[in-house]
Swiss-Prot record:
The keyword Acetylation does not apply. This is DNA mismatch repair protein MutS. This protein is involved in the repair of mismatches in DNA. It is possible that it carries out the mismatch recognition step. This protein has a weak ATPase activity. It comes from Bordetella parapertussis (strain 12822 / ATCC BAA-587 / NCTC 13253). The keyword Transit peptide does not apply.
Length: 883
């Protein structure tokens, strides 16, 4: 049963104290959100909020008096520990309304004035302590419009940086788009029914937030413009609806306008190489198949020196580009960094430009997020100090980029680093060299910045001389040699006299505190001075807070250039990290062409090669005359690694990175598909085979001649003949209809006949060799089909009992003998005469049985335990069995 009163007006509030009435009004405003209600040094929660918070945060649940005759549940957290509790709540998908005291307790006649100043939700985090340093945390909104031809509008905002994006797609693509963006929170209309998987928090808002006119008006008002034409979104009505609703929600959570959100970036179909959720997972771009952060492609490449660079690298890996021009610009910048390093020894000594640049980047904080917090007025003093120091280092970094002028992109980035000198000068004058953590602690504004503050500080802190003089005068006046003038936070200033000297105390001394061995007094002169000092401390802190607010006002005009500078620093950092990785590991610049083609010479898997001592390079050629590679070979032979390797090299090439190969040529791709591995979707009621077919259906429906498709052992989840038939039909469809660039791994050797019918298909295999010790995987891709699968040898290496291996070998021989005249390829070719087939099967079955019996007898003999006579007898028996 709910312990919270259901109404907050009229008679419902009459039975509550004024403070609780205030709380209930604010709680009604917060709605279902947890309300952190500031009371002194604690945030308190009451009623259901207290019970919920106590359960989620493991807090002690207490009571605070009675209201309407019922004890009020209460739980609280210290103000200084708020961030750690917020982080835990947000991780659990909770949202919290922060209510602060905004009135002066000393001047308040009733409850101190309070107001909800901020709402913290999973998608609206801006505090450094709550955000992952190397990943974005976006807030998204979705709106589906139209009945005859529905369109899904999607908007997403990174509140910690101000980046605001929109796009439109078919409703069926919405889940894939959300997986690409990976927002922490999704806003949708109350009546909207979105049947799709989404792991983040969902928030419903009134339908009218998504109405076209209101959403458009919200955007026009925010950007202070009469038209959205300048943002290139006029032809995206569903996206505009989503963007307006999102901006309204985000502004409400911050209780202010979002000054750092200064533009909308419209993303169009065809801008990126599309990767569906299955492909992102299978390629392990930023998360392993087991959910770990390492080893992944991102963890391998992330040598960035700033959090901004790491986040940009993550975005690049998830958003490979289709068009060659921007990719080539990045690639050229990386090549220039490497070339200057090799040839620019005179300018940069032995270290080289690349090392100099990367070392310089170490000095830069997360300017992207600091700029956002300046706009939101939540920036901390020490962040401003780090920004000040970064601006001091910026001119030297800018000058060091001069040798990169051969790269147009590097020149553009260098130009973006230029900052107005005023901001650096302002921060240098205003912020103390080592400011306090929070403005409430004082010591943030630098000495000399404000004369009034300097006077108050002097009055509050430089009273040492006065106290020394007062103590000397009082000792002389009273004749008390051990008299002391001291201070503590509880009783303020006092004169302490030992018990044995109290008879010498003058009449103007007033007792302040009695101790066991001493008395403490105050005099009119000391009281007057105490009032001045304590008043000066309060006024000093108030003045400093006011000056800090004025400083934030002055810094607001620099948010845009700060954001541009941060963007340039992030890209320079990312490019330098990719250049350093290419230099260390012998990666090369791929050739980018317009046609759909992949030609790799001696390619390597970027992650696997770093995990093993020796990696075998392999090439791959897919072009107009060679659309599909049918890949056969043993289990553990490296088929899946090879396929992923090709996809990762293609993806890296489309991000602008160098690639692990001796030579590579990669064309314009529109999508990358993968069908690798097997997994059940138990919650969705789909078996392994159903999942396999669902993924295959998506590939057949969407792949084009410009797509790269990876299909691994399709059809293995059902019976042999069903699986073979499906694998053949799917491969044939991909080859003749979709015409996608396809890597098709299979254990169905019957499929290796496909190139005989379709010349644009080719056979390759992962080589293996048998030795006395068993099978040896060569991990080398060779032309032509494999001769066998070596499944039993792999099982033997895995530790399957010898008896099972022997029985499996006999069964394999029997099956091969039976199936030799009528291989499964008979599904697609004419069968032999039935009588001839039957006779051959009978003869081979008899031979196989005799051979199996002989093998069993031989395996049962232990030569070491036989006498010479017994060994000779055994040999005769075996010989007789053969005849």
């Amino acid at each position: 049963m709910s312990s919270t009163p259901k109404q907050t007006t009229g008679d419902a509030l009459a039975g509550h104290t004024p403070m609780m009435q205030q709380y209930l009004r604010l709680k009604a405003e917060a709605g279902p959100l947890l309300l952190f209600y500031r009371m002194g040094d604690f945030y308190e929660m009451f009623y259901e909020d207290a019970e919920r918070a106590a359960r989620l945060l493991n807090l002690t649940l207490t009571k605070r008096g009675n209201s309407n005759g019922t004890p009020i549940p209460m739980a609280g957290i210290p103000v200084h520990a708020m961030e750690q509790y917020l982080a835990r709540l947000v991780a659990l998908g909770e949202s919290v309304a922060i209510c602060e005291q905004i009135g002066d307790p000393a001047a308040a006649k009733g409850p101190v004035e309070r107001r909800i100043v901020r709402i913290v939700t999973p998608g609206t985090l801006t505090d450094e302590a709550l955000l992952p340093a190397k990943a974005d945390r976006a807030l998204a909104a979705v709106c589906v419009t139209g009945k005859r031809e529905p369109r899904a509008g999607l908007a997403w905002l990174n509140l910690a940086s101000g980046a605001f994006h929109v796009t439109e797609c078919a409703p069926g693509q919405l889940e894939s788009e959300l997986h690409r963006i990976a927002p922490a929170e999704l806003i949708q209309a109350e009546s909207a029914e979105l049947h799709m998987a989404f792991e983040g928090a969902r928030t419903r808002v009134p339908d009218w937030h998504f109405e076209a006119d209101g959403a458009r008006a919200q955007l026009l008002a925010h950007f202070k413009t009469d038209s959205l034409g300048g943002f290139d979104v006029e032809d995206m009505p569903a996206a505009v609806c989503a963007a307006g609703a999102l901006l309204r929600y985000a502004a409400r959570t911050q209780s202010q306008a979002l000054a750092h959100v200064q533009t909308i970036a419209a993303e169009r179909p065809g801008q990126y190489v599309l990767l569906d959720p299955v492909t992102r997972r299978n390629l392990e771009l930023t998360q392993t198949l087991s959910g770990e952060e390492s080893p992944t492609l991102f963890s391998l490449l992330d040598g960035c020196r700033t959090p901004m660079g790491s986040r940009l690298l993550r975005r690049w890996l998830h958003h490979p580009l289709r068009e060659n021009e921007p990719v080539l610009a990045r690639q050229h910048a990386i090549a220039t960094m490497l070339t200057v390093r090799q040839e620019g020894e005179q300018a940069f000594a032995a270290a080289g430009l690349l090392e100099t640049l990367r070392d310089a980047l170490n000095a830069f904080p997360d300017i992207e997020r600091i700029a956002a917090r300046v706009a939101l007025r939540s920036v901390r003093p020490r962040e401003l100090a780090s920004l000040r120091d970064a601006l001091v280092a910026l001119p030297a970094l800018h000058a060091s980029l001069a040798p990169l002028s051969g790269s147009p992109r590097a020149r553009e980035l260098a130009a973006q680093l230029a900052m107005p000198p005023d901001i650096g000068e302002l921060l240098a004058r205003a912020v103390a060299s080592e400011p306090a953590v929070a403005i409430r602690d004082g010591g943030v504004i630098a000495a000399g910045f404000d004369s009034e503050l300097d006077e108050l500080r002097a009055l509050a802190t430089d009273g040492g001389d006065f106290l020394v003089q007062l103590e000397a005068r009082e000792r002389e006046r009273t004749g008390i040699g051990n008299l002391r003038v001291e201070f503590n936070r509880v009783h303020g200033f006092y004169i302490e006299v030992s018990k044995g000297q109290t008879d010498k105390v003058p009449e103007d001394y007033r007792r302040r505190q009695t101790l066991k061995n001493a008395e403490r007094y105050i005099t009119p002169e000391l009281k007057t001075w105490e009032d001045r000092v304590l008043s000066a401390q309060d006024r000093s802190l108030a003045r400093e807070k006011w000056l800090y607010e004025q400083l934030l006002d002055a810094l607001a005009q620099y948010v845009r250039p700060l954001s541009q500078c941060a963007s340039a620093l992030a890209e320079l950092d990312t490019l330098a990290a990719l250049a350093e990785h290419a230099r260390r590991h012998d990666w090369v610049a791929p050739e980018l062409i317009d046609g759909a083609e992949i030609d790799i010479e001696a390619g390597r898997h970027p992650v696997v090669e770093r995990a093993i001592e020796r990696f075998t390079p392999n090439g791959c050629r897919l072009d107009q005359t060679r659309r599909m590679l049918l890949i056969t070979g043993p289990n553990m032979g490296g088929k899946s690694t090879y396929m992923r390797q090709v996809a990762l090299i293609a993806l890296l090439a489309r991000t602008g990175s160098f690639v692990p190969a001796t030579r590579a040529r990669v064309g314009r791709l529109d999508r990358i598909f993968t069908r690798i591995g097997a997994a059940d979707d138990l919650a969705g009621g789909r078996s392994t085979f159903m999942m396999e077919m669902t993924e295959a259906a998506a590939i057949l429906a969407a792949s084009t001649p410009a797509s790269l498709v990876l299909m691994d052992e399709i059809g293995r989840g059902t019976s042999t003949y069903d699986g073979l038939a499906l694998a053949w039909a799917i491969a044939y469809r991909l080859l003749t209809h979709n015409r996608a660039l396809t890597l098709f791994a299979t254990h169905y050797f019957e499929l290796t006949r496909l190139p005989a019918e379709q010349p644009t298909a080719a056979n390759v295999h992962l080589a293996a060799a048998e030795s006395a010790g068993g099978i040896v995987f060569l991990h080398e891709v060779r032309e032509g089909p494999a001769s066998r699968s070596y499944g039993i040898q792999v099982a033997q290496r895995a530790g399957v009992p010898a008896a099972v291996i022997r029985q499996a070998s006999r069964e394999l021989e029997r099956l091969e003998a039976q199936g030799a005249p009528t291989p499964q390829l008979g599904l697609f070719a004419a069968a032999l005469d039935a009588d001839v087939q039957s006779q051959a099967m009978t003869e081979q079955a008899e031979d196989a049985a005799a051979l199996a019996q002989l093998r069993d007898q031989l395996a049962a003999i232990d030569p070491d335990s036989l006498t010479p006579r017994e060994a000779l007898d055994a040999l005769y028996r075996l010989k007789q069995h053969l005849t």
